[in-house]
Amino acid sequence: MTIQGLIPATLTPFNSAGAIDHLALSKHITSVGAATGLYGIAVNGHAGEILALNDDERQAVIATARSAMPPGLKLIAGIEASSIDGLVRQGLRARDAGADMLLVIPPFDVRVYRHLSHNVEAVFHVFQRLDKEVALPMIVFQYPEPSGCAYSLDALERIAALDHVVAIKASSGTPAKYAELHDRLANKLALLPAADSPSLLGMLLHGAPGSLIGISVIGTQQWSDLVFEATRGNAQRAKEIHNNFAVPLMRSIFEYHMHWTATCPFGATKEALVQMGEFSSSWVRPPSVLVSDDKKIEIRKGLLQAGLLKE
């Protein structure tokens, strides 16, 4: 299975009552999907606030996205649970709602389970059940080491042998950690850099086939161009797009993943789309923190520097 190109991780818009705005979601999927050079579109990831959605809402998001998907693109649905049975149920519901692929959020991101992410058999058991019982292509979400639940290389190599494990969302943190993954696993599955920070460029230039990132819903075509140039070795052109377009957004919206403020980065992403006229609200569900007035000003500056707004 060849995976090549950008996969934007989309947002979940809410209305004034805090319910999912399915009309706005449909428009969001259509808008993002209009860019060229995409492999697919992801829903129900962290950017889509999966942790704030109940099971029925998660399935409804997938169904809405399915109906709005442009032809030729894969619909990738995030699944999340802290039990294997829960993950399987999520996977089956995602499949029933029309997902083509799954993004498997680590079930080990719970204090008492984190050490198990290094245990080959524990990790294999999770993905073996998904492989057999859901039987959809899977993207494994690899967290950075400081999370405490990054999968060991041995565990990743073991699950790469499963028929339906086709890619890793490599939220590795640094180009060096991405290179370590690449050296061990690039001949077995697709390694998709996932960084809404300047470390992305180095990962893309290290033989990546594509990328899966949330920030790319802002000016999706430019992000797709960045991925295209970098993955084809056009380093100078990729650097120009990265420095002139991507970095101002990485700084103002995702704060280089340094968390300088308590602002939810996905709320900040929504606010950018509000300022661009694509969203009507930047509201996020608690406990996420809403975008402050000062942050809105900072986001506007980033959009201006990236050329997405004019004075």
Language-model segments: which ranges?
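Active-site glycine- and acidic-residue-rich loops that bind
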Residues: A81-D85, S172-G173, M250-R251, H259
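C-terminal alpha-helical cap/extension of soluble enzyme domains
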Residues: T2, I7-T10, S31-L38, L205, ...
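Alpha-helical structural signal in soluble globular domains
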Residues: A35, A60, T64-A68, R93, ...
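Active-site beta->alpha loop and helix N-cap motifs at the rims of alpha/beta catalytic domains
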Residues: T2-A150, L309
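Catalytic alpha/beta core domains of metabolic enzymes, predominantly
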Residues: K132-E133, P144-F254
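A general structural signal for well-ordered alpha-helical segments in protein cores
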Residues: I62, L87, F127, Y178, ...
